[in-house]
Amino acid sequence: MSIASIDRVAAQGRWRNRPLAEKCLIGLGFLALAVTVPPFPGAVLVTVAILAFTFLGARVPLRFWAAVAVLPLGFLTTGAAVLLIQIGPDGIGLAPQGPAKAAALVMRASAATCCLLFLATTTPAADLLSGLRRWRVPAELIEIALLTYRFVFILAEEAAAMTTAQRARLGHATRRRWLRSTAQVIAALLPRALDRARRLETGLAARNWQGEMRVLSTRPAASPLVLGLILTLQAAILAAGVLL
């Protein structure tokens, strides 16, 4: 799943025009809860709430979300499996408290991952950067982030074009050819990336770039009622996670 696909779904989604403050409060607020409240029931309640916002509120397609989540959740599962075993003088065995630690890790990290995926699939990067500008983040940092973000798309397009060309020439027919073709892509990607960066710099200079790239944003103001409801829900989950 490419970064461009995620940004496209966020730009075309149901919550595309929701105020940025509301989406950030949901994503970052629940993320803070996920890493602070006890894994059970706090992190579980965070996961349920953020998935409800994702699928029932924002209507993010389930199949697309699963395709995006499979890699981080798969990595999480592998990391949790390591906690189940230990290597000692007697060899490999089940670690004491291993299942409990693995379960706590899975619950807490899954909740945090779902929060970040909510923000990624509902908020385009341009909106996040324009929000940072309104929050008085230094313009230099915003411009570096914006140029880096756009350059990632350029690199992805270059790599995809090179891989497609290799497949058309049967460069992936066997495992040996695949390894050789992949090495060639990696070796050729850096010179192409530097060339594209040079052309990008020349284009910006030709347009009299003064160190700031403005992005048009017409987002409505956040509703105090909606913000209050979100905070109330988060406070309820915090209380449940601490008291239960």
Curated annotation (Swiss-Prot):
GO cellular component, one term: ATP-binding cassette (ABC) transporter complex
Keywords, sorted A to Z: Cell inner membrane, Cell membrane, Cobalamin biosynthesis, Cobalt, Cobalt transport, Ion transport, Membrane, Transmembrane, Transmembrane helix, Transport
Cell inner membrane is among the record's keywords: yes
Membrane topology: Multi-pass membrane protein
Record pathway: Cofactor biosynthesis; adenosylcobalamin biosynthesis
Compartments it resides in: Cell inner membrane
Gene Ontology terms describing biological process: cobalamin biosynthetic process; cobalt ion transport
Major subcellular location class: membrane
Recorded family membership: Belongs to the CbiQ family.
Oligomeric form and interacting partners: Forms an energy-coupling factor (ECF) transporter complex composed of an ATP-binding protein (A component, CbiO), a transmembrane protein (T component, CbiQ) and 2 possible substrate-capture proteins (S components, CbiM and CbiN) of unknown stoichimetry. Subcomplexes composed of CbiMQO can be isolated from membranes but the CbiN subunit is not isolated in association with them, suggesting it is only loosely associated. Expression of just CbiMN in E.coli confers some cobalt uptake.
Function text: Part of the energy-coupling factor (ECF) transporter complex CbiMNOQ involved in cobalt import. The complex confers cobalt uptake upon expression in E.coli; can also transport nickel with a very low affinity.
Protein name: Cobalt transport protein CbiQ
